[in-house]
Amino acid sequence: MLVLAALGCREDAGEPTAPETTAPLAVAAAQALTFSKLSAGGGHTCGVASDLRAYCWGLNFNGQLGDGTTTQRLTPVAVAGTLEFRQVSAGLNYTCGVTTTNRAYCWGQGEAGNLGDGTKMDQSLPVQVAGGHLFRRVDAGDAHTCGVTTSDEAYCWGFNDRGVLGAGIIQRQSTPVAVSGGLKFRQVAAGGTHTCGVTTSDVVYCWGSDSVGQVGDGSNTAGVFVPTRVATSRRFQLVDAGLGAFTCGVTTADKAFCWGSGRNGEIGDGRDFLRFLPRAVTGGHAFDRVTTGGTHTCAVATDNRAYCWGLNAGGALGTGTSVARSLIPVAVAGGRFFSQVSAGKSHTCARSGAALS
């Protein structure tokens, strides 16, 4: 049976007594649910189960669990309604997902327009993103959301500080606007105040705040309002901007690189410096997936072992110790094999079992 494990979780752990945990523990009720995908957010976690329903647990002050209430849940609760999902993304205080019919829905905190329904209101039930676009996947950040359509076009909506929507404008948007440049994207990741994406030709572009180098173009300007190519010739298969001020990605050669704020070791190169250009993660591991949180990073290696690095607040690294931080990748305790790991603001969740399709 697949086990959903939580690291460094409290209310967001989905474990009945909700303690902080420094090593993986099974999420209560997950034994009755087989999850195919999961996403850790600010203080909540969501996943798609084998019945194609979305389930969430954790903090719920803004309705981010989508069950029609604002009551926190210590175990997974089904998102209200009959929608069937192929993917979900937990942001800081809200959640978005794509249904099996490629429609995007969001719920939770929406004062920045990040729910995409044309309002700036919180919603405790899923609301459809306006515009009629067919999305392949969406990604929820601090207060803005981005998605890639079935025709490989990128759209963003919500808070627009420092050009984080990538549309060449400064106003926040409560409905999707096209990312400038006409690029075709495979994937887009919404971060704290920046966004990055991988094109269909395996090139990484970033935009938004570049105050600590998270855009990766070698500068640290206040804001980048249109997609800017990251200064590297390497080809990438995926990128993640997380809920912090740094970015990580995995190349087509299965190597992890990070850039931006590294004050807590989240870059993984053995130093605690800012990095304005991509830096190789130390250790020589071959990675399939990487995920960035608020101040920590985790990744799944090609042998399905999980590693984390950065700040260990609340045990987010899953090492089984209370060490304050790690500047290099450390193995997640317990010897499990993982198919997916998702880093939230200060907690991490992972799915153990066979690789995801």
Q: Predicted segment positions?
A:
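Bacterial signal peptide processing site
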Residues: G8-D12
